[in-house]
Amino acid sequence: ITNVNQLWEVDLKYGYIAGEDRFFYLMSIIDVYDRVIIDYHIGLTCEGRHAAHILERSLWKRKLINTSTRPVIRSDNGPQFISNVFETACKTLSVEHERIPPKTPNLNAHIESFHSIIERDCYAKNEFNSYTEAHKTVTEFIDFYVNRYLHGSLKDMPPAEFHKIVVNTGLTPFIVRV
């Protein structure tokens, strides 16, 4: 991968709401090159329609919706990603959907890494009493990750800053091997 918007990864991460004794879902899309979480869904359910929605919003956010530039979207074989709704959205949006083989999370390493970070630095440090609290805390953490979290692989810059440099200068300082 040599630039932004070539390969995006999408996956789910569960979180627990102790005060309500139930789980919530975080579905995130990451750009493999700049590590920006382009869009995400936080909810008490997580279905193919949610995956389709954040994919379309990601294309809008990256200003790709009215261009011919399209990333490949890589996922595992979760029910959200093999659903007719998501597959139809990929076709309608002209996005190639690549599914990794079962039991190979290393092939989705960048989104898995982000989900490990959010587990360690957000979920494990907070006991959520309500869905509202979980939603607020996770949203704030994602904002922190995108705008202030320093990545060694991004020359010690936060993803958003690195993204701006790449887009504004055309600088592509490295190749990401996937």
Which stretches of residues belong to each language-model region?
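Basic, flexible linker segments flanking DNA-binding modules
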Residues: 1-7, 104, 158-167
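Electropositive, glycine- and tryptophan-enriched low-complexity nucleic-acid-binding patches
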Residues: 31-42, 51-54, 60-61
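Hydrophobic (often cysteine-bearing) scaffold residues that line and stabilize catalytic clefts
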Residues: 26, 47, 51, 74, ...
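Generic alpha-helical secondary structure signal
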Residues: 85-88, 92, 109, 113, ...
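Mobile-element integrase/transposase regions
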Residues: 1-28, 53-57, 61-62, 68-70, ...
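RNase H-like polynucleotidyl transferase catalytic core
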Residues: 69-77, 91-110, 126-131
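Acidic/histidine-rich, metal-coordinating catalytic segments
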Residues: 64-83, 105, 155-160
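C-terminal domain-tail junction helix/linker
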Residues: 91-95, 117-178
